[in-house]
């Protein structure tokens, strides 16, 4: 969608997800394999470190190179794992792993939101969904439940 000559951020919601971080790893791998760079925006330093470890170790037969935004290899690393959002190095794919909408999401070409089966997570996701929709963003929904497969 275009607005005044600018492309609006493409927003994708993946819902009914059993394991949010495993799905985030899979989506990061998929984007990286397509030559896209991913900015994983985590809740805090601990969550950021945990997700980074998962990227290095999962899936079992491969890994997804990642680093922090201040790493000397950040400019050439496919996935940046961050929790501050103060030093954005690219504008391709933003993977939101927080419960609130990222204030800088609109500078990215694509935003990915992952919604688990947890009721609190679903409530917070509904708030984000409404926020984006009320601002005119088109949202693509992806049902990852077993019944949808």
Model-derived segments and spans:
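Helix-rich interaction surfaces within compact, conserved domain-sized segments
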Residues: 103, 121-129
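Trafficking entry modules
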Residues: 110, 114-121
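Positively charged, polar, low-complexity stretches
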Residues: 2, 6, 10-106, 117, ...
């Amino acid at each position: 969608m275009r607005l005044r000559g600018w492309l609006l951020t493409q927003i994708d919601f993946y819902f009914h997800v059993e394991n949010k971080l495993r799905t985030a790893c899979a989506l990061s791998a998929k984007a990286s394999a397509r030559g896209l760079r991913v900015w994983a925006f985590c809740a805090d330093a601990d969550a950021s470190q945990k997700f980074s470890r998962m990227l290095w170790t999962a899936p079992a037969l491969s890994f997804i190179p990642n680093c922090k935004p201040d790493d000397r290899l950040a400019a050439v690393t496919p996935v940046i794992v961050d929790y501050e959002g103060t030093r954005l190095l690219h504008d391709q794919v933003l993977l939101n792993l927080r419960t609130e909408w990222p204030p800088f999401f609109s500078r990215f070409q694509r935003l990915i939101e992952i919604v688990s089966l947890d009721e609190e997570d679903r409530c917070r996701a509904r708030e984000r969904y409404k926020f984006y929709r009320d601002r005119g963003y088109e949202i693509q929904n992806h049902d990852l439940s077993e019944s949808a497969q």
